[in-house]
Amino acid sequence: QALHHVIGMFGKMNPDPDARRRFIPMGSMGGYAPGTNAGFYPDDSGTFLPKDAKFSFQMHYTSFGKAVIDETQVGVWLHKKKPKNMMQGTFIANYDIKIPANTKRHTESKEYTFEREALLYSVLPHSHFRGIASDFVAIYPDGSREMLLSVPNYDFNWQLRYELVEPKLMLKGTVLHVIAYFDNSAGNIANPDPTVAVEYGDQTWDEMLQVFFGAIPVEIVKPCTFKLP
């Protein structure tokens, strides 16, 4: 009840003791959100952990009037030999969302451009109580479009990671267009307050448009990286 979500990362420490950000993220260590299912990498793939990498876990708590103990656990499985493929976790977000009060179906969007060819394996959308649906459309370099995933009934309590039946080739220059739908009306029984306009924020009474997805570059140019928005 208290743990809202966990964001795991690995990286290195900034040698400058006066730096605003001491921890420099380099890759994803996964995470947790209500109802999230386990993510499985394809055979002969993994995430590259550099020598002397540090782990960071951002724990987000929401109070509910009772003292409790966090029993979160983290498990790491190591390959006995170097895998063939490097899975890369990418996170994108729209920090400028503005959802009007008393609005039944409001849309917001965000785009991500693939800078090199990659195989897309999984997608995980994240919103709060006003999030109701999302669509993921690939816009290929030739201008053609393809609906990769439609989530018609998003539920904050079941934030699922969607594994594609077959990985999808994202050509260099392909745009992943994400459309999120929000219900800020009194008809949404989970809505904390339909009378107020809502913007991006960390608390559940705020809102978010975030997407986490996993992909393997067709040609590995450098070790796994974690792209910050």
Where are these regions (language model features)?
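Beta-strand-centric surfaces of beta-sandwich/beta-rich domains
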Residues: Q1-L119, P125-P229
